[in-house]
UniProtKB/Swiss-Prot annotation:
UniProt KW Cytoplasm keyword: yes
InterPro entries reported in the protein's UniProt record: EPLIN_Lim_dom (IPR028740), Znf_LIM (IPR001781)
LIM zinc-binding domain boundaries: 386-446
A Gene Ontology term for the protein's cellular component: brush border membrane
Keywords per UniProt: Acetylation, Actin-binding, Cell junction, Cell membrane, Cell projection, Cholesterol metabolism, Cytoplasm, Cytoskeleton, LIM domain, Lipid metabolism, Membrane, Metal-binding, Phosphoprotein, Steroid metabolism, Sterol metabolism, Ubl conjugation, Zinc
UniProt keyword annotation of Metal-binding present: yes
Extent of Low complexity compositional bias: 599-611
Region: Disordered, residue numbers: 43-151, 168-226, 241-379, 468-493, 505-714
Organism this protein belongs to: Rattus norvegicus
Name of the protein in its database record: LIM domain and actin-binding protein 1
Amino acid sequence: MESTPFNRRQWTSLSLRVTAKELSLVNKNKSSTIVEIFSKYQKAAEEANMERKKNNTESLPQHFRRGTLSVLKKKWENPVAGAESHTDSLPNSSSDGGHTADHPPAEVTAKAAPGARADREEHTQPRSRFGSRPEAVTQCRYPRSEDSHDFKAQATESQNMENCLGDSRHEAEKPEMSENTETSGKIEKYNVPLNRLKMMFEKGEHSQNKSPWTQGRNAGGRRLSENSCSLDDLEIGAGHLSSSAFNSEKNESKRNLELPRLSETSIKDRMAKYQAAVSKQSSPASYASELKPSESKTHKWEQKENVPPGPEACSIHQEGSKVSATENSLVAHPVPAEDDTCNSQGRSEAQQPIYTKPLSPDARTSSLPESSPSKTAKKFQAPARESCVECQKTVYPMERLLANQQVFHISCFRCSYCNNKLSLGTYASLHGRIYCKPHFNQLFKSKGNYDEGFGHKQHKDLWASKGENEETLGRPAQPPSAGETPHSPGVEDAPIAKVGVLAASMEAKASSQREREENKPAETKKLRIAWPPPAEQGSSGSAPEEGFKVSKPKWPPEDEVCKTEAPEDVDLDLKKLRRSSSLKERSRPFTVAASFRTSSVKSPKPLSPSLRKGWSEPEPEQSEEFGGGTVTQTESPRPSREKESVGKSRWQSEEAEAEAEEAPRGRDGRSFELESESFIGNGASIAEDDVAPAQRSPLEPESPGWPGFGDTTTAKEFNQKSQDVGFWEGEVVRELSVEEQIKRNRYYDEDEDEE
């Protein structure tokens, strides 16, 4: 490739080769004439490129345009390659946007080369050339309208063929127009000021010099073939014309490829097509004449970089084509005699808006920023200001959380009870308040407490009063949160008041449960003094009362040293458990009494000395037997269960007799000992604990080894054994000594009354 500033022209032939291949691929099922025409055009383009190379070496850069025109004129004078060379120059005029108005004058200039040279020399100055271009356009239009009159006789024979072939040609041209608009437009745009304008001037002068009759004879067939797409394009409408303004170069090149064909269109169709082409040609030509001095550099830069035309140019072309389309719709079917007036009117109408359009790029640049702020304002327009239900501050989109038809900050979406942060999957709401699911279940669903939980009515007046006091003292931050909820749309004032009462009642409920749990140990201490309960309560099998609930820690049986009370306790527990129908009451000894097992096991430690002291004085035999029984039990607790039961029964019978004989003293001593035992085992007050050592102190020197022995062996071992074997031992004892236990319980009642 030679280093010339217009090497880009070779891209035209290359792009046209590509379009020929694409056309052959697209139009496989259609007529092959278009492909043949393209092949001829390719050859002509290659020859033109070779001649351009030769002329480029001979001519200077400023006279390079003349050399190009001479080469083109030679190709036009050639009858074989006239059409191809003409189309080679025509693609260089993309800004003209006209469909067919340029080709007939091309042939006219081919026959009048000297006049064309003179015209080119006259207009070497670009400014003068641009100024005279509209005049040249007007000059080249009048003879064309006359030529159309002359070709009536020639075209009548081939109207039907042209109408048939026009449709196929139009269909064949459509895909290429859509495919190659960008490539051809980019590459061919740079030749607008060079060849296209000169051709227009040559056409203008030659149309003045030549008679319309000779012009008609020479260019009639080609012009009619150019206008072959007669009514099809007009029927497409203004939208297609405006879109095809960009594709004008491609359409012109295709029509020039069809030059060898004969014309077959009717006069009316040809006139309509001709006027449409004239109006379209005048609008881009006049615009290009004023656009060139100011934007030739930008055009060259665009073509060098193969950049598609700028948005302003595109919009200008579209506007020009729209104006021409409106003019075409007005001048669709004129009378042949009115051609000149219609052409002049269309030209003046097309030029008037276009002379105002060179100002439009500036106006457009100013209007684009005006329109863009509106778009940006729409894009960045903040939505309606939203405030958080909890904190009443503005909620921005990134921290917005929509839950329960209310807007929250993500950080403010917390449980109103425990203030833990929640998400959409871990919250539950009631009357506009947000809770975590555990507290929602705990507050509103536990124990079937629906009325209180859901705020329909106060469940218990006691709890409500407690809750009001606690709400003012313990939790002053909750009423503001309850007051914030009215801002949410779905919450009313009455439910909010209910929710306040509800929260108070919930806290009252929780506090009452805690108080009950705290008070239970104290109650058990008081009630264990009255243990065992009366026989009527155990035999009745009624629902266990508070005293019975507290007596459960007595189970499992205490140390084997204290077998005097343990079998009876076990027996009563078992009877009550078996007679009570609820599983909850049966399982309660193993759940509620877990905390009291250790204390109940520790309580027998001082019992053996106290018992020994209480019964050793009146009946030494009883104490000896009891001592032997206890010693054997402690020494061999597991293998001697039968002996234990027999010893217990014997001891209980003797004990009953002893109680009958010496009631006042034995009862007093035993009652005080039992009191001291119970209070020491459960950590009772110190005043009552002092009574027990006073009772115990005389006996301690007699049996020094008993307390330690009971500590080390029996308490620890039996704590495990009683849990495992308690029920079995209870059954055996119950079968042996039911009556004695009833008697003993009655005696305990009398003891308590006496005390």
